[in-house]
C-alpha cells in the first residue's frame, strides 16, 4: 500500500543517522550595529533593539562563496582528523550564485585531489535560505538508501547575505557551516517527523543576474515566514501525535515537548516573534486552554484566526510576553551567532544549532529533542526535529561535538570591528567588481583568519584561483585557529563501516597551496 512501510523496515536502516560533526566559519571582521545606526542616521535602537542585532559580519572582495566553503570544509576535516576518502557524498546548499553552470561542489573537489577520491555524489541545491536543509535531507536519505556505500555524507551550507543601501542592509551577514552526516550520530534525525510547506510567492528573490542584491517585499516576507511556520508546525504536530498514538500515548504535542527550538534567523527579533507564534498555535489548539494556567491572561484571544494575526500588534505583544520564559529556556541561546554575525541565509539555522551546542554541556543536552524550523523565500519551509543521544560520557560522540564548538564565542570575540564607512566602502567595492573578469582583488589578506581560503584572481575567462592564508604557528584548531594536518592515519571520529576499499592516507597539503577552477 502506498505510504506504508514493511514491518521489518526499521531493521534495514543504519542506526541513529544524524549529525556526527559540525564546523562553522565566519569572516574575521564585522561592523557594530549601534555604530551603523549612527552612520545611517536612523533612531538609536532601530537595528539593535528593533531587529535584535548587535554585530554584522561581512567579507571583502577576497572572499566569495567558493572560498567560504573551501574554508569550512577543510577546517572540519582538520579539526576531526578525517581522511578525504571517507566522504561518499558532498552537497552544497547556497543561494550565492557566481556561476550559472559550474557548482560550488565542483570547486570543493579540489580539496579531494590528493586523496584520489573522486567517487563522491551530490551537487548544489538552491532555494533561497532553504537549500542547506534540502541538502541535509538528501544526505540523510542517501545514508538510509540502497545507494549508501558506508561512507559519510558532507553537507555545506553557506552564503554572503548583502543588501543595497537602505532598511534591509543591517539584516545582512556572511557564514558557512559544514555538517558531517552518518550513523551512530549524537544528533539523530527523528524519522517521519517533518512538517513541510511549499508555496509560490515573490517575497524575496534575485532576478538580476548581474547583482548580488535581492528584491525584497518586507511585509510579505514576514507574512510568508509566519504562515509557513503555522503550516509546518501543524503538520509536525499531527505526525508526532500519530506516532505517539501507535505507542499508546494519547496527548497533543506542544512547545514544552521540545528541549530546544531553533529557527532560520533573518534577524533575532523575528525569531522571538516566531516562538511566540508557536505558542499561539498551542493556545488555539488546546481544547482545555481555559483550565491551563500557562495561558492565563490570554482568554480574550480564544477566537482569533491565525491568518488574521500576522500583523496584529495586540496578539503579538500578548503572546511574546506570555512565551518569554519559554523563549529564554528554549531559543535565546541559539541566537548567539545570529546576534553577533547576522543572517547567513542557508547556514543561518545551522549557526543556531552550533550556538546551542557551544553553550550547553553534554549532560544538559542529552536526551533532548531539538525542533528545527528552516525557511527559504519563494517559498520552501520545513519543521523537523533532532533527538540528542543519551550518552553524555567523556569521549562520547556528544562530548566530541560540543567540545569542537567550545571556542565559538571566543572566535566571535576575536574578530576585528570595522568602522561603518569602511564597511560601506567594501560593499561598494563588491557591487562594482563581483562580476568582473580579469580581476585581482584589492583588499589585503592580512585581515583574514589564518587558514582561510581566499580569492587570488579571476582571469579573462572568469576562472577563479584560490589560495589559503598560511598559519604562523603549527598549533591545533582545538587551541584556536591553528593547523591540524588532514588525512592523518588516526581519525578522531571513527568512519562508518567501510563497504569500499580505504585509500591510503596522504600528507597534508602545503599551507601555501594554490588551487584554481581552470587551467592557466
Curated annotation (Swiss-Prot):
The active site is at 95 (proton donor/acceptor), 129 (acyl-thioester intermediate), 264 (proton donor/acceptor). Residues 507-520 have a biased composition (Polar residues). One of its GO terms (molecular function) is protein homodimerization activity. Its main location: cytoplasm. CoA binds at residues 44-46, 167, 221, 269, 273. The modification Phosphoserine is found at residues 4, 495, 516. Homodimer. This is Hydroxymethylglutaryl-CoA synthase, cytoplasmic. The lineage of its organism: Eukaryota, Metazoa, Chordata, Craniata, Vertebrata. The gene is Hmgcs1.
